[in-house]
Swiss-Prot record:
It comes from Rickettsia prowazekii (strain Madrid E). It is found in: Cytoplasm. Keywords: Cytoplasm, Flavoprotein, FMN, Isomerase, Isoprene biosynthesis, Magnesium, Metal-binding, NADP. One of its GO terms (biological process) is isoprenoid biosynthetic process. It catalyses: isopentenyl diphosphate = dimethylallyl diphosphate. One of its GO terms (molecular function) is oxidoreductase activity. Involved in the biosynthesis of isoprenoids. Catalyzes the 1,3-allylic rearrangement of the homoallylic substrate isopentenyl (IPP) to its allylic isomer, dimethylallyl diphosphate (DMAPP). This is Isopentenyl-diphosphate delta-isomerase. It is an enzyme of class 5 (isomerase). NCBIfam families: IPP_isom_2. Its cofactor is FMN; NADPH; Mg(2+). Substrate binds at residues 11-12, 99-101. Its EC number is 5.3.3.2. GO terms for cellular component: cytoplasm.
Length: 342
């Protein structure tokens, strides 16, 4: 096996291990904690009539939840992805896969990503770093990733800070937008552009929408800090000092949502980054999101058992439904207009 492929697998293994064992959270909070719903003591709604259903990528979902992209490429990642996918299928929610670049150079990693057979009905998202378009990945190869796992969309993730704090990271980020547009025009499915924990600004969102992007995952600061993950991976003190200095970098999830409010009418917004509960998810929907994503706590559960993932998802859904009832919101559209205070 070429040395570069070995390094890719080693890096993915280290990422899982560090995320499970170390505190890699940003020192920033998501900002959602500053929002308070106005409690409705007389909601006049039957709990059984609360409707959390929605549609995403043409598929029905029982709740507006995305299992955010995490991993792939290793045996441990295969088990994690299978458990996440099975739980997503049973819960009626969406799932994103981790970066699939390794599949283009190491085809035998395919089993770590192919989960459609255990999750036939869910919105399933393929995933690759957008910067890879500057390093030889073609629109045709992006379509190959989609076809291989029977995905409903392709995530192009923007992870500039993560790449720059990796010793082996990709540093050429020029002229990327035209290449993203090429992929959008070539593919048979929609493209989702996603940050990885540092937020999307209004200016960047406008550029992406103009290029044809219909779904944005803001992935704001407040959750996992990938620069902090790289600080733990650092092989020397200099690398550690550089990476760890960015632990409070980024646009918080709430600030990113507020920036995108006036331009989000015709696109789908996924809110992720530091969300910890269905209450946080409800706040994100109130601030303009259509769907909310979580990763960290589901990763920890999926490393152990599918039943724990199912339990976490059920807790999140129940928190969402209780929040809806306590704000007098029968549907997600009602929740998006619920009274709040700061």
């Amino acid at each position: 096996m070429p040395k570069e492929q070995n390094l890719d697998i080693e890096r993915k293994q280290e990422h899982i291990e560090i995320n499970l064992k170390q505190n890699v959270n940003s020192t920033l909070k998501s900002g959602l904690e500053s929002i308070k719903f106005i409690h409705n003591a007389l909601p006049e709604i039957n709990y059984d009539s609360i409707d959390t259903t929605t549609t995403f990528l043409g598929k029905d979902m029982k709740a507006p939840i995305l299992i955010s992209s995490m991993t792939g490429g290793t045996a441990r990642a295969r088990d994690i992805n299978y458990r996440l996918a099975q739980a997503a299928q049973k819960s009626g929610i969406a799932m994103g896969l981790g970066s699939m670049r390794i599949l283009l150079t190491k085809p035998d990693t395919i089993k770590t990503f192919t989960v459609r057979h255990v999750a036939p009905d869910i919105p399933l998202l393929a995933n690759i770093g957008a910067v890879q378009l500057n390093y030889g990945v073609t629109p045709k190869e992006c379509q190959y990733l989609i076809d291989t796992i029977k995905a409903d969309a392709l995530i192009l993730h923007l992870n500039v800070l993560h790449e720059l704090t990796q010793p082996e990271g990709n540093k050429n980020w020029e002229n990327l937008l035209p290449k993203i547009k090429e992929v959008i025009n070539y593919l048979s499915v929609p493209v989702i552009v996603k940050e990885v924990g540092y937020g999307l600004s209004k200016q960047v969102a406008k550029k992406l929408i103009k290029a044809g992007v219909k779904v944005l995952d803001i992935a704001g600061s407040g959750g996992t800090s990938w620069s902090q993950v790289e600080a733990y991976r650092a092989k020397n003190s200099m690398q550690n000092r550089i990476a760890s200095s960015f632990i409070n970098w980024g646009i918080t999830t709430l600030d990113s949502l507020k920036m995108l409010q006036e331009i989000s009418k015709d696109i789908t917004i996924i809110a992720s980054g530091g969300l910890q509960s269905g209450i946080d998810g409800a706040k994100a929907i109130r601030m303009g999101a259509n769907i909310f994503g979580l990763a960290g706590k589901l990763l920890k559960a999926a490393d152990i058992a599918e039943s724990l993932v199912l339990e976490e998802i059920q807790v999140i859904i129940e928190q969402l439904k209780i929040t809806m009832l306590c704000t007098g919101s029968c549907t997600l559209k009602d929740l998006a207009k619920a009274e709040i205070m700061w």
